[in-house]
């Protein structure tokens, strides 16, 4: 079982996610990919990857903005990406608006856990990836750690590591490297306080997050500690995975 949350239709989850993230991105500034701790990994994969796709980047893209295709449910985010030279299309990870085998490098950070039908999401990522393509993705782990924060930001599930590997393998993806990931504060009290302000003082809370908390998180983020295969996830709340699309 991937999540202790009650089942919700995909359409309801989509509406909840669109409402939350449109409000978030409307007041946000775009943060360049080079500023994230994922950039060294991304940069190492760019040379052989001329066709690139990032799913649900918001205003935190990890791939270079120019010459990358972006798909997102947020018109606000896509509009700002376009002003910086990005190519953006409204769409969902469960119905990617692209043909088969069209991309050499795909990023999908913090998105698979948001959809009801994650099997379809993974099938779509597999469909648009060429054989040998790299997929960088991240997901929250351990259903026992489910909290009000997960529900608030529109998560459908947290993953058991073994089940996650099985799901990826069924859709042709093998994990090459991984690392602990995420910028969520470790203090439950701080998370609860942030949620309270987002519920009761939404506009100023979003401004504070976008203009103060997020820039500070980016500035003080630690380098990714990548390891071969899947890391020991016992104490890891969220994991980044570099996967490779198998040829069969």
Language-model-detected regions and their locations in the chain:
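Conserved N-terminal segment of class I S-adenosyl-L-methionine
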Residues: 1-101, 105-109, 122, 179-181, ...
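S-adenosyl-L-methionine-dependent methyltransferase catalytic module, highlighting the catalytic core
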Residues: 3-9, 16-19, 27-34, 116-124, ...
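A general structural motif
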Residues: 49-50, 130-132
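A short alpha-helix capping/helix-coil boundary motif
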Residues: 58, 102-105, 132, 141-146
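Surface-exposed amphipathic alpha-helices with a cationic face
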Residues: 60, 126-130
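Active-site loop signature of alpha/beta-hydrolase-fold enzymes
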Residues: 76, 96, 114, 142-145
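Residues lining the SAM
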Residues: 109-112, 138
